[in-house]
Amino acid sequence: MVTIRLARHGAKKRPFYQVVVTDSRNARNGRFIERVGFFNPIASEKEEGTRLDLDRIAHWVGQGATISDRVAALIKEVKKAA
């Protein structure tokens, strides 16, 4: 099953997440099909905290991909801000 979820990157105590489309059987930070955005939970006010390619996310959902709870909350937040 294809899923859209967060992959953790960054340093210790400084997380940075990439929003990726991947097979649900792959490891959290393992192989992915496509990167569709990023999320920086500790971004300063002058840095961009979240960027999502909503068109590609809609494409993958149309193909049957499921969305993780956290990514769904990020999508809702981005749409509200736009």
Swiss-Prot record:
Q: Which SUPFAM superfamilies match?
A: Ribosomal protein S16
Q: Keywords, A to Z?
A: Endonuclease, Hydrolase, Nuclease, Ribonucleoprotein, Ribosomal protein
* Keyword Nuclease applies: yes
Q: Name one GO biological process term.
A: translation
Q: Write down the InterPro entries for this protein, in alphabetical order.
A: Ribosomal_bS16, Ribosomal_bS16_CS, Ribosomal_bS16_dom_sf
Q: Which PROSITE patterns match?
A: RIBOSOMAL_S16
Example of a GO MF term = structural constituent of ribosome
Q: Name one Pfam family in it.
A: Ribosomal_S16
Q: Name one GO cellular component term.
A: small ribosomal subunit
Q: Which PANTHER family match?
A: 30S RIBOSOMAL PROTEIN S16, SMALL RIBOSOMAL SUBUNIT PROTEIN BS16M
The record describes the protein's role as: In addition to being a ribosomal protein, S16 also has a cation-dependent endonuclease activity.
Family annotation (NCBIfam families): S16
The similarity comment for this entry is: Belongs to the bacterial ribosomal protein bS16 family.
Q: What is this protein called?
A: Small ribosomal subunit protein bS16
Record organism: Salmonella typhimurium (strain LT2 / SGSC1412 / ATCC 700720)
